[in-house]
Amino acid sequence: MFRGASAINLDTKGRVAIPKRYREPLHVEYNSQLVITVDIQSACLLLYPLDEWSKIEAKLLLLSDTLPAERAMKRMLLGYAHECELDGNGRLLLPLPLRQYANLGKRAMLVGQLNKFELWDETAWQHQIEQSRETIQDEEFAENIRLADFSL
């Protein structure tokens, strides 16, 4: 399981070094194979271990090719999906279209989300954190039935 936020840098070739604490689990449990795609609700990327991505693909197979919303979701997630492997130095090469989608600059944030990572431009991540704080204070958040029994 992946958790925590790590500041990382993109090099001039568009590579990111995955923090060391994640490299061994990714190598041992997932053979260093990942799939990177776009987040359809935020300007960030999603990095899935290949086994986890396979579960997403199984769900996508069940969606319609004729219903516009389902077709659009499939196009985005699958159209941008890129298989990759950590190199010997624990780096991933991010294809240019993915970097452009997430507006990634030199400084980025890799954020663990249990079964996947989000990859954000650092400034966009800070903005997202502020938006999340506002959302948590919103009445709609307090009325969310799925969150009613959630406590820390």
UniProtKB/Swiss-Prot annotation:
GO terms for molecular function: DNA-binding transcription factor activity; transcription cis-regulatory region binding. Residues 5-52, 81-124 form the SpoVT-AbrB domain. It comes from the Bacteria. Coiled coil: none annotated. It is found in: Cytoplasm, Nucleoid. Its main location: cytoplasm. It holds the Pfam family MraZ. Keywords: Cytoplasm, DNA-binding, Repeat, Transcription, Transcription regulation. InterPro entries: MraZ, MraZ_C, MraZ_dom, MraZ_N, MraZ_sf, SpoVT-AbrB_dom, SpoVT-AbrB_sf. Forms oligomers. Belongs to the MraZ family. This is Transcriptional regulator MraZ. It comes from Shewanella woodyi (strain ATCC 51908 / MS32). The lineage of its organism: Bacteria, Pseudomonadati, Pseudomonadota, Gammaproteobacteria, Alteromonadales. The gene is mraZ.
